[in-house]
């Protein structure tokens, strides 16, 4: 099952050239970029690990691609995304985020039905990947 999170998530994976163009777009807008990774693909997992520090004031797409490639090399079986932050209003908020790497095999999710009081049905999404310890999921 293909995880769909962020901009361009329903499109085929971006090529390095397309990623560079998106980086240039973010730089032209004055956004700061950062690289994050995780092995827990749950849709509500918004706390991914940061790869280094955010790349404030970096104006060269090659420098950001260098960080993306370094993260891909070390975390090749992880989900990796590139985030662009817009701080024009004084409060940083994500303006764009998209995946730049994903594991070779994505096991998907199970939907569990849970009975609550008064026969109320509740549902829970659980990633098959999280059944293994962190760092050994893919």
UniProtKB/Swiss-Prot annotation:
The keyword Plastid applies. GO terms for biological process: reductive pentose-phosphate cycle. Its main location: plastid. It is found in: Plastid, Chloroplast. GO terms for molecular function: ribulose-bisphosphate carboxylase activity. It holds the Pfam family RuBisCO_small. InterPro entries: RuBisCO_ssu, RuBisCO_ssu_dom, RuBisCO_ssu_sf. Keywords: Calvin cycle, Carbon dioxide fixation, Chloroplast, Photorespiration, Photosynthesis, Plastid. Coiled coil: none annotated. GO terms for cellular component: chloroplast. CDD domains: RuBisCO_small (cd03527). RuBisCO catalyzes two reactions: the carboxylation of D-ribulose 1,5-bisphosphate, the primary event in carbon dioxide fixation, as well as the oxidative fragmentation of the pentose substrate in the photorespiration process. Both reactions occur simultaneously and in competition at the same active site. Although the small subunit is not catalytic it is essential for maximal activity. Belongs to the RuBisCO small chain family. Heterohexadecamer of 8 large and 8 small subunits. In this alga, in contrast to plants, the small subunit is encoded in the chloroplast. This is Ribulose bisphosphate carboxylase small subunit.
């Amino acid at each position: 099952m293909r995880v769909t999170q962020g901009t361009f998530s329903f499109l085929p994976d971006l090529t390095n050239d397309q990623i560079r163009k998106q980086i240039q777009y973010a730089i032209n807008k004055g956004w700061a970029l950062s690289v994050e990774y995780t092995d827990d693909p749950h849709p509500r997992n918004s706390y991914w690990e940061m790869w280094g520090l955010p790349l404030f004031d970096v104006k060269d797409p090659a420098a950001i691609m260098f960080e993306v490639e370094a993260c891909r090399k070390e975390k090749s079986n992880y989900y990796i995304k590139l985030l662009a932050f817009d701080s024009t209003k004084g409060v940083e908020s994500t303006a764009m985020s998209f995946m730049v790497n994903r594991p070779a095999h994505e096991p998907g999710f199970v939907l569990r039905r849970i009975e609550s009081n008064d026969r109320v049905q509740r549902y829970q999404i659980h990633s098959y990947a999280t059944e293994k310890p962190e760092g050994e999921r893919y």
